Amino acid sequence: MTEPDLSPAFVLHTRPYRETSQLVDLFVASMGKVSVVAKGSRSPRSSVKGLLQPFLPLHIHYGGKSSLKTLLQLEARSPQVALQGERLFSALYLNELLYYLLEPDTEYPGLFSGYFQTLLALADQQQLVSPLLRQFELLLLQQLGYGADFCYAADSCLPIDPACYYRYEPEAGFITTALRDHAFFSGREIIGIAEQAFSDEYILAAARRFSRQAFAALLGNRPLKSRELYSAFIARRSE
């Protein structure tokens, strides 16, 4: 009997199901977001009880013809990525974006490896958190089909001018404007975001502002729990 092919995966979200099982949303390398039922995974003697955790690289096998698959095999392929404090909440933020925005059973080439590399980079205390988040956000937007054109203005098709100002319209792109306030971007900022020149704090702040606008349009009114948890963490630390 041949061994089943195992797919690399990460857990995005779990919730209890019936008495001893779980419903699990997975990020699978070859299939994007996949929802499975892990039968008996909450029972005391379950062999997979401690494996359905976020940030633990997994190999999985699942089956079924409905949108809810059945988890058939699960094993850890390397140790859990060690994350604490701000870095943990940042990784939870990435998981929420993937959970809410990925289409079920849809492959996103390059996104899985980008996610894994971002987790590893977040675990490296020598790397700054904010640039890593901005890089992944840009990758995710591009993979979702909402990547902005940072080279040309949507209204004129002219190259972005460092001396001009633009507003961002999620369905269109950057549109030239004469107004200037916190919601608008200079051409210099847009070019800097395109180049991912995030060692420049001015560009890094603009990239964060851009991501907030872009994801607000996609997430709608859905609140991100990771932001609430991080705010509570900061409040407790400052007491």
Curated annotation (Swiss-Prot):
Highest taxon above the source species: Bacteria
UniProt entry tagged with the keyword DNA repair: yes
Alphabetically ordered keywords of this record: DNA damage, DNA recombination, DNA repair
Record-linked Pfam families: RecO_C, RecO_N
Gene Ontology annotations for the cellular component aspect, listed alphabetically: bacterial nucleoid
GO biological process: DNA recombination; double-strand break repair
Transmembrane parts of this sequence: none
Matching InterPro entries: ARFGAP/RecO, DNA_rep/recomb_RecO_N, NA-bd_OB-fold, RecO, RecO_C
SUPFAM superfamilies, per the entry: ArfGap/RecO-like zinc finger (SSF57863), Nucleic acid-binding proteins (SSF50249)
Main function: Involved in DNA repair and RecF pathway recombination.
Similarity field: Belongs to the RecO family.
HAMAP family: RecO
Protein name: DNA repair protein RecO
